[in-house]
Amino acid sequence: MDLISVILISIGLSMDAFAVSITNGAMISKVTASEGIRIGLFFGGFQALMPLIGWSIGIKFESYIAALDHWIALILLSIIGGKMIYDSVKENQDHKDEIACDYAVGEKKCLNNKTLILLAIATSIDALAVGVSFAFLKVSIINTIVIIGSITFVICFIGVMIGKKCGKLLKKRAEILGGVVLILIGVKIFIQHTNILSYIF
């Protein structure tokens, strides 16, 4: 997998965490750079850890389903991307927002480490599934998870900083964009591995 694809996947995966970071930034009474760094480290760390776990699982079964790798990547990324889009347009409040709001007390909002761990896990489950597909795509897993973690950290830091001003609007658009990006990457991988365009043109 080329570097551009890894970066795009990283951005797509980070959109869910970005959306929650915006929510956190909007609910914290006084947003500081140190708080943004702390939130970014939690989300970036888990977003890097989950693909590694998924990759480890996928490696164990590589010999059995290597011939289906492109289908696995397409299906996983499409399901994840579709879920992100669906979650962003449904009317009910997102569950991750409910977790964050449960820790709100009056105007001064509490965002302790336990809260961040719960939110980081909730927003990195998709990365676990993507990690499984990495096992069949010949990627450098260490470089990949470093990129994913770093991009997520930066994006979440930015999300916290701007959450106060444009939280709700940007949250929805970020999740939709992330979903579309993941679906397109899945289609790209499928086309490359099957060389299907050569049969059409």
Swiss-Prot record:
List membrane-spanning regions: 3-23, 39-59, 65-85, 116-136, 141-161, 176-196
The alphabetized UniProt keywords are: Cell membrane, Ion transport, Manganese, Membrane, Transmembrane, Transmembrane helix, Transport
Its main subcellular localisation, reduced to a broad class, is membrane
A GO molecular function annotation here is: manganese ion transmembrane transporter activity
The UniProt record lists the keyword Nucleus: no
Q: Where in the cell is it found?
A: Cell membrane
Please tell me one Gene Ontology term that the record gives under cellular component. plasma membrane
Q: Name the family the entry cites.
A: Belongs to the MntP (TC 9.B.29) family.
* This protein's name: Putative manganese efflux pump MntP 2
Q: Which gene encodes it?
A: mntP2
